[in-house]
Amino acid sequence: MLMSVFHNWLLEIACENYFVYIKRLSANDTGATGGHQVGLYIPSGIVEKLFPSINHTRELNPSVFLTAHVSSHDCPDSEARAIYYNSRHFGKTRNEKRITRWVEAAHFRILKITGALTLLAFKLDEQGGDCKEVNIWVCASTDEEDVIETAIGEVIPGALISGPAGQILGGLSLQQAPVNHKYILPEDWHLRFPSGSEIIQYAASHYVKNSLDPDEQLLDRRRVEYDIFLLVEELHVLDIIRKGFGSVDEFIALANSVSNRRKSRAGKSLELHLEHLFIEHGLRHFATQAITEGNKKPDFLFPSAGAYHDTEFPVENLRMLAVKTTCKDRWRQILNEADKIHQVHLFTLQEGVSLAQYREMRESGVRLVVPSSLHKKYPEAVRAELMTLGAFIAELTGLYADIP
């Protein structure tokens, strides 16, 4: 029932005059960090389209109000505010646009929406004036998120996808970011789509060379690899789209092919990058997809599958690392993947969690491993307990230093 409501909502938005804004909510977006910059950041180009009346510096912090309706949850409508913080032009430093008050603060706490994939659909003004309303869907389940990511590809934390609703939701969305054409692809890739491992191997020659920090390296490598993936996708799909389709079945077949490839990449990319970084930084004692109790397969088991099943190996020296791009609800899936390990580690790129979510994770025996540059996006009270990727690697290389 709920999924049919979601599908109907998407169809309505795609068929009418809406502009959609899609992202995963960071802790700053929801106020979970406790910082003063609460609200959704809006790029200047979007402000010009949606709220032209505030795109100026004739006065301090011009703003406009609009009605915010949350279709996904039982929340009362609220009065959202689109504001241009332009104090840089008045002797101070701030220069950014945000949407604030789009859901009352109390509902953030109730819904635990930090990390959730969220769609904001702005009803465009037919006369070119300011938008008067925004219709919001905060995905409450992985099933809802899968519907969106099947259509438009993986939505990674920090990424913003926006555009006319019919273009983004109403058909085959080829890309969400400008394709970088600086890469010269191998000739045989013009004839076949390379595997994820092949793309990562090719990308290695384009990584930033002056960093030895695994936290920085991971984020840079993900960016480069994704740029190359988009270029390969364009190479194989764009001409087909331009030529058009002889039937609906042909269109659906291509859409399914693109969707399956995107999901496959999203599921393996992060694990492959971590595996390479472990080896580069001297952490060689690990197993991927090793079988544990109940035929479970954790992403990484340390130091090996053999050690895990060896009754003589010290249990306190076993480690497990689960890998989730986002961890809003998915973190619970990892709790019983290795019964012998009472504190499991979870690597994520999610931009913050609420204090309540963090406490629930900690009480369940989950320790977060997060790239260092993302720590500031978490509530200040928990930052000291977050582990960097570099610290995780250093701890385990030391722990297993005596293993041949």
UniProtKB/Swiss-Prot annotation:
Keywords: Endonuclease, Hydrolase, Magnesium, Nuclease, Restriction system. InterPro entries: DNA-bd_pseudobarrel_sf (IPR015300), EcoRII_C_sf (IPR038365), Rest_endonuc_II_EcoRII_N (IPR023372), Restrct_endonuc-II-like (IPR011335), Restrct_endonuc_II_EcoRII_C (IPR015109). The active site is at Y308. It is an enzyme of class 3 (hydrolase). CDD domains: EcoRII-like (cd22322), EcoRII_N (cd10016). The keyword ATP-binding does not apply. It comes from the Bacteria. It catalyses: Endonucleolytic cleavage of DNA to give specific double-stranded fragments with terminal 5'-phosphates. Its EC number is 3.1.21.4. SUPFAM superfamilies: DNA-binding pseudobarrel domain (SSF101936), Restriction endonuclease-like (SSF52980). Its cofactor is Mg(2+). One of its GO terms (molecular function) is type II site-specific deoxyribonuclease activity. The keyword Nuclease applies. One of its GO terms (biological process) is DNA restriction-modification system. Homodimer. This is Type II restriction enzyme EcoRII. It comes from Escherichia coli. The gene is ecoRIIR.
